[in-house]
Amino acid sequence: MTSFKLVKYIPRIKKKKSGLRKLARKVPTDRLLKFERVFKAQKRIPMSVFKAQRVLDEIRWRYYEETVMILNLMPYRASYPILKLVYSAAANATHYRDFDKANLFITKAEVSRSTIMKKFRPRARGRSFPIKKSMCHITIVLNIVKKSK
């Protein structure tokens, strides 16, 4: 008779290799000026976090002009409020800090969950059905890149 050895099973989880490291190499961190950045946040956007995240993953670690071009051509509904947010952040950078739009670079683009608006829809036989409208907060950080010599 053979005996089996009981061993604790630990599943191996392969880590996904993120493409962000490649994109982050486009502009070395020593060329990003540490305190030369502009924050812009928009709160309570009526959109799912996952839909916004899909668009923000495409624009992170890109220059401003490239970002505007990508957002204009994206077929997602989530790209319009994000485009307005990026425009506003760039306008703040040029108006208040006298930055050049050609040197602006998106270093941080994140989305977080906000409140959920709950409504009830009338159904058959006097019953009601809950509708949950999710909202999100989006934060964009534009950093200025100094010119290489």
Curated annotation (Swiss-Prot):
The keyword rRNA-binding applies. Keywords: Chloroplast, Plastid, Ribonucleoprotein, Ribosomal protein, RNA-binding, rRNA-binding. InterPro entries: Ribosomal_uL22, Ribosomal_uL22_bac/chlpt-type, Ribosomal_uL22_bac/org-type, Ribosomal_uL22_CS, Ribosomal_uL22_sf. GO terms for biological process: translation. CDD domains: Ribosomal_L22. GO terms for cellular component: chloroplast; large ribosomal subunit. Pfam families: Ribosomal_L22. It is found in: Plastid, Chloroplast. It comes from the Eukaryota. One of its GO terms (molecular function) is structural constituent of ribosome. SUPFAM superfamilies: Ribosomal protein L22. Part of the 50S ribosomal subunit. HAMAP family: Ribosomal_uL22_B. Belongs to the universal ribosomal protein uL22 family. This protein binds specifically to 23S rRNA. This is Large ribosomal subunit protein uL22c. It comes from Hordeum vulgare (Barley).
